[in-house]
Design a protein with these regions (language model features):
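Entry/capping segment at the start of metal-dependent catalytic domains
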Residues: 1-30
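Active-site-proximal helix-loop-helix substrate-binding element of RNase H-like nuclease domains
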Residues: 32, 37, 41-58, 63-146
């Protein structure tokens, strides 16, 4: 394995927009719900962690291996969340050396900072669905009591 593309969905009661990713993952109720990945450009696989599925040892080792290049849109978020998920000691995170951020690469080329915006500008056949965005917000963002 040379590369792994990663996309995760998470939950935390902490508002990430107001507090940032570090506080977000420190919440007692933080969890990774879904882990999608593709190895060396192959078929995308989805691990439903929220329903008891587990990452294979091969994937865990790839996350820890600095020789495997990890790609993600907003890689900093994925890296910090997965550091917590892997139960690394507090203040210890996966090494950024082996991570590549497609959001930053997109911005470098003058594209929007959102995955949805990049898809629109590039005219990609498969776009981020608005319904999916709404579902993620519903399941991954805690509700404010009324």
């Amino acid at each position: 394995m040379k590369t792994i593309n990663i996309d995760i969905e998470t939950f935390s009661s902490i508002n990430i927009s107001k507090s940032g990713v570090y506080k977000y993952v420190e919440s007692e109720d933080f969890e990774v719900l879904l882990f999608a990945y593709s190895i060396d450009g192959g078929k995308t696989e989805i691990v439903d962690i929220a329903n008891g599925e587990e990452l294979s040892e091969e994937i865990i080792q790839a996350l820890l291996d600095d020789n495997v290049i990890k790609w993600a849109f907003n890689a900093q978020f994925e890296r910090i969340c997965l550091s917590r998920f892997l139960k690394l000691p507090k203040g210890t995170y996966l090494n950024p050396k082996s991570w590549r951020c497609t959001m930053i690469w997109s911005a470098y080329m003058g594209l929007p900072f959102s995955l949805e915006g990049v898809g629109k500008v590039l005219g990609l056949e498969k776009q981020k669905l608005i319904e999916g965005k709404d579902l993620i917000k519903y399941f991954c963002v805690s509700c404010t009591p009324t």
